[in-house]
């Protein structure tokens, strides 16, 4: 696809297999086309590697963080489980939402929590709401520790952001989906992988070996979940869909 943006005429010109067309800026399709290109360019220049949340690096798109906040506010979980810790920014993000609500704990799981990251997380003022568990998120013994940390929480929200291979994410979906309460969400991050094949820091098999492919297989075998983004709590826009690193990654448990 070839895209040309004419700011004087306020149009986006698109040339693809179906021909050429000019889309006015006022058409939601123009926003969709430009957003997809922006996501790809952002990947190439590592746009998400420049944000922090309350002092800790958080490698997420700002829009994705806002949508997570909306979902947590709406579902009011007693416990939030995140696989993939890295610098701990997302853990602190979730813990800050719990702190504002005056309710909830956060459990972070990673196969390796580097000492400097652990020290920074443990020194953070929100650490009392966080439990760190080091181990393979798909190992039975690790999952048991997570389940113990969640305890008797009635409302549980799960965010999967560790190893992004299809098989690993599928195993996580099967395991951690059992923790999610009815009405809450199971989120598989980084399904954008299939859209950035050929970009820097990618692998040739990402078109099939990615979290989105795991979600498809999981939904085919599991009828307690549906693919469904949280409802917009406020939306006076003409925008269709989301500008996200995990399109199609929101799963709501319906029973």
Model-derived features with residue positions:
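Membrane-proximal envelope and lipid/glycan-remodeling enzymes
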Residues: 16-19, 23, 43, 154-157, ...
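N-terminal auxiliary segments of SAM/dcSAM-dependent transferases
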Residues: 1-35
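Intrinsically disordered, low-complexity segments enriched in polar/charged residues with Gly/Pro
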Residues: 1, 38, 44-45, 165, ...
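S-adenosylmethionine/decaboxylated-SAM
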Residues: 10, 51-255
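Class I SAM-dependent transferase core
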Residues: 32-60
């Amino acid at each position: 696809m070839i895209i040309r943006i004419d700011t004087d005429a306020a149009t986006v010109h698109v040339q693809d297999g179906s021909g050429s067309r000019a889309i006015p800026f006022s058409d939601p399709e123009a926003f969709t086309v430009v957003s997809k290109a922006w996501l790809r360019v952002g990947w190439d220049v590592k746009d998400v590697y420049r944000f922090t949340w309350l002092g800790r690096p958080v490698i997420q798109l700002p829009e994705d963080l806002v949508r997570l906040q909306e979902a947590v506010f709406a579902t009011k979980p007693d416990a939030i489980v995140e696989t993939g810790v890295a610098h701990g920014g997302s853990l602190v993000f979730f813990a800050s939402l719990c702190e504002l609500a005056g309710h909830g704990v956060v459990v972070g799981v990673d196969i390796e929590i580097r000492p400097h990251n652990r020290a920074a997380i443990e020194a953070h003022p929100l650490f009392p709401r966080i439990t760190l568990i080091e181990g393979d998120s798909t190992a039975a013994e690790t999952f048991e520790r997570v389940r113990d940390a969640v305890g008797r929480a009635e409302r549980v929200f799960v965010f999967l952001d560790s190893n992004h291979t299809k098989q690993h994410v599928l195993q996580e979906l099967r395991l951690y989906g059992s923790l999610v309460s009815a009405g809450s969400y199971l989120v598989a991050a980084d399904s954008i992988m299939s859209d950035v094949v050929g970009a820097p820091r990618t692998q040739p098999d990402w078109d099939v070996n990615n979290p989105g492919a795991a979600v498809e297989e999981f939904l085919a075998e599991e009828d307690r979940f549906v693919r469904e983004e949280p409802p917009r709590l406020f939306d006076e826009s003409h925008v269709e869909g989301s500008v996200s690193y995990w399109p199609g990654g929101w799963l709501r448990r319906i029973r």
